[in-house]
Amino acid sequence: MADKIKLEVVTPERVVANEHVDFVVAPGVEGEIGILPFHAPLITSLDIGILRYTVEGKTEKIALSGGFLEVKGNKVVVLANAAERGEEIDVERAQRALERARERLARRTPDIDVLRAELAMRRALNRLKAAGKM
């Protein structure tokens, strides 16, 4: 049996993943972070992005909305603000959120919080990517 690393992805609401995996790629704030079994200890911040991992040659995707990652021992723990597996994502809802964010950014009226609209657009695009729709 090949070496595995334990992956736990947790949000305030639920445990999204709890399994032994071959490899993890996480969206760090400075770029992607690749983690193999027996990785050196690490704590880092995560950005909005796709967490990818492989199990028995199959790649799984989880859309993250930021958070923190810790590698300790032979375990990766992701504490995420929000996380959804690709197959759980409501694609129509994500597309509507993307359209709303783009409309707000196009208007750019004084009452629009541009940063909030940009973050909403990034989250919607990320969810669509995780669902395989982009």
Curated annotation (Swiss-Prot):
GO cellular component: plasma membrane; proton-transporting ATP synthase complex
Keywords for the protein's UniProt record, in alphabetical order: ATP synthesis, Cell membrane, CF(1), Hydrogen ion transport, Ion transport, Membrane, Transport
SUPFAM superfamilies for the chain: Epsilon subunit of F1F0-ATP synthase C-terminal domain (SSF46604), Epsilon subunit of F1F0-ATP synthase N-terminal domain (SSF51344)
InterPro entries per record: ATP_F1_dsu/esu_C_sf, ATP_synth_F1_dsu/esu, ATP_synth_F1_dsu/esu_N, ATP_synth_F1_esu_C, ATPsynth_dsu/esu_N
Disulfide-linked positions: none
Any Pfam family hit: ATP-synt_DE_N
Gene3D superfamilies documented for this protein: ATP synthase delta/epsilon subunit, C-terminal domain (1.20.5.440), F0F1 ATP synthase delta/epsilon subunit, N-terminal (2.60.15.10)
Summary of the function given for this chain in its UniProt record: Produces ATP from ADP in the presence of a proton gradient across the membrane.
Subunit comment: F-type ATPases have 2 components, CF(1) - the catalytic core - and CF(0) - the membrane proton channel. CF(1) has five subunits: alpha(3), beta(3), gamma(1), delta(1), epsilon(1). CF(0) has three main subunits: a, b and c.
Family classification: Belongs to the ATPase epsilon chain family.
Record protein name field: ATP synthase epsilon chain
Native source organism of the sequence: Carboxydothermus hydrogenoformans (strain ATCC BAA-161 / DSM 6008 / Z-2901)
Gene: atpC
